[in-house]
């Protein structure tokens, strides 16, 4: 048959169908999660996952609502409103619609890539919902809408376990020799194993366990699994380490999450002047 013309309406129709199919089962059953946690109670990690699931439910509900409404517009059951036109226009340009973006996380991805990212985030949250009393062996920090809250939870757990004052604790990072999340055998003995970090402006030397200069034409260097824990500020020894800012996206600035500590043989100033940073979502 003849190929359909590439018009905003045709692109909008195609996206509407595929997105509704993609996310048809994506609402998390928070009542079930509550029941599962009734006996064991909710710790700091559980609270973060619950917040993340609730936020994702709100986003998914809006995505579905707006697409069903757009479908009614296409079918002539509703008059096309300005909001519906904007939604259709964004999909045509492969951009994340504003009404979705407002409920989502910082992202510089085009829409097609964002939807894949969205599915990956849902997968991590669903895996947690299936066994909410267990702390995951390793956590994809990039998959959280609010990654800072997970780092705070790490501090809270250590403060409770070790009877320390929460406000005197600082997040400490140790880059492990575990190259990928699949290779993590069990949960970290202290703190949590996290992945999803990329180094921008430098690379990580796995053999020597230190920061080094990037290779020519190398954009980002995926990091091994990082063990995030916490220490009282007065016990922190920064010798041989540099404070590396971690951001959610390549936009940096307002997307700052925390400062990690990375090992270096060079003076820290070298990396600071080069603008080296960890990025949680390089947004391919």
Question: Where are the language model's segments positioned?
Answer:
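Long C-terminal appendages of very large multidomain proteins
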Residues: 1-284
């Amino acid at each position: 048959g003849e190929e359909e013309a590439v018009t905003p309406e045709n692109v909008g129709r195609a996206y509407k169908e595929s997105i509704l199919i993609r996310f048809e089962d994506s609402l998390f059953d928070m009542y079930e999660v509550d029941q599962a946690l009734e006996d064991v109670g909710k710790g700091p990690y559980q609270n973060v996952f619950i917040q993340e699931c609730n936020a994702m439910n709100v986003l998914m509900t809006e995505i579905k609502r707006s697409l069903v409404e757009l479908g009614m517009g296409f079918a002539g059951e509703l008059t096309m409103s300005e909001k519906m036109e904007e939604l259709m226009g964004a999909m045509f340009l492969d951009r994340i619609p504003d009404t979705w973006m407002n409920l989502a996380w910082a992202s510089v991805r085009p829409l097609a890539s964002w939807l894949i990212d969205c599915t990956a985030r849902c997968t991590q949250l669903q895996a947690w919902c299936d066994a909410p009393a267990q702390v995951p062996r390793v956590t994809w920090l990039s998959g959280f809408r609010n990654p800072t809250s997970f780092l705070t939870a790490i501090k809270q757990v250590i403060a409770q376990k070790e009877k320390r004052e929460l406000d005197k604790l600082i997040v400490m990072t140790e880059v492990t020799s575990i190259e990928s999340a699949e290779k993590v055998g069990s949960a970290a003995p202290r703190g949590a194993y996290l992945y999803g970090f990329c180094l921008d402006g430098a690379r990580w030397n796995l053999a020597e366990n230190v920061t080094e200069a990037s290779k020519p034409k190398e954009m980002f260097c995926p990091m091994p699994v990082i063990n995030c824990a916490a220490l009282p500020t007065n016990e922190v020894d920064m010798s041989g380490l540099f404070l590396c800012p971690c951001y959610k996206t390549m936009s940096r600035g307002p997307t700052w999450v925390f400062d990690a500590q990375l090992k270096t043989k060079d003076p820290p100033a070298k990396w600071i002047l080069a603008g080296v940073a960890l990025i949680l979502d390089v947004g391919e």
